Amino acid sequence: MEQREKMFSEKGNWYKGNLHSHTTNSDGRLTPEEAVLAYRQHGYSFVCFSEHDYYTDTRKQFDCEDFIILPGLEASAYMFDTTGIEQMPEGISLEQGYVDMTMENAKKLLQQGFVPNRIKTHHIHGILGTEAMQKAAGDKVFRENEYVPFCVYFNQWDGREVAQKLSDSLKERGCFTTYNHPIWSRVDMEEVRDLTGIWAIECYNYDTVNECAEGQDTVFWDAMLRRGNDIMGFASDDNHNGGVFPDSFGGYVMVKSEKLDHENIVSNLLSGNYYFSNGASITQWGIHNNKVYVQCDGAERINFICGGGIGTSKTVMAENGIALTQVEFPLTGRETYVRVEVHDMQGKTAWTNAIT
């Protein structure tokens, strides 16, 4: 593994952001204006409005000295079980295998009473990348307020191929990509673990944590890391603000950056100069003299999660109610990667990315 003494840059400030958010531009309940006001009032510095299959860029409207928008979208592919449906709606044939469906056509089908069972989905973010990524995409960069058709498959699909094509198509348009809420999406491990070129996987989704207890998972992430997939993780809200349960201000990233602007925030996300959390904090971590260490504001337990042989991981727990603020863990050399989880005294968690 790489010997990196400090994973977070010494220069810069910490900026809090939500990378997964929905407004009235898709199926959210808050207008973009209401969402920006709410997140600014709660100490956030940036938000990505990731509307379903709809790319928006509201930077001109909302960017200011202490808050910015990351343009993006949440692109979709679905597999439907059509068992029991006697006749498909006009224009759709099971022999096609799949259709590229616009939101307008989907609404028409619903009006016709077509309610298939959605058995699997891939939800993949495309977030506008760096200036270099946009330049490489040329005239393929997303236009403001652009709808993207979503793929609908009937009864079967090659899940890995579908996800890979979806991610690749977003990257071709100047975006970096994330794989969202795999447990909620009902996907199998083999459909995800060998995906390439995806920046991060969503390990904590506040909305589905509260909706159905299917929003927190690191098993998919570790499975990818164990196979040599150099992928990062992130936490988010995926807020829709429907009012039935809270889904804002619960999952976020903390990015270290010298400036609060699109280029710097995105560059620091891509380089791993951040941690993600649902309430706990981490101030620094790294590897020094073959020991991995972490500094935090006070933890009840700290997990060092390692790839490699059985028994390489370790947990350190606070004793006699005295919170942990700095812990180190000697490495054996057998580890293929290491990442850290900090659980604070209030039961909240912060996650680092992996050193590989």
Describe the function of each predicted region.
Residues M1-L19, E33-V36, C64-E65, D81-I92, ...:
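Charged catalytic cores and adjacent phosphate/nucleic-acid-binding surfaces used
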Residues E2-F176, N180, V187, Y204-Q216, ...:
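A metal-dependent hydrolase metal-coordination microenvironment
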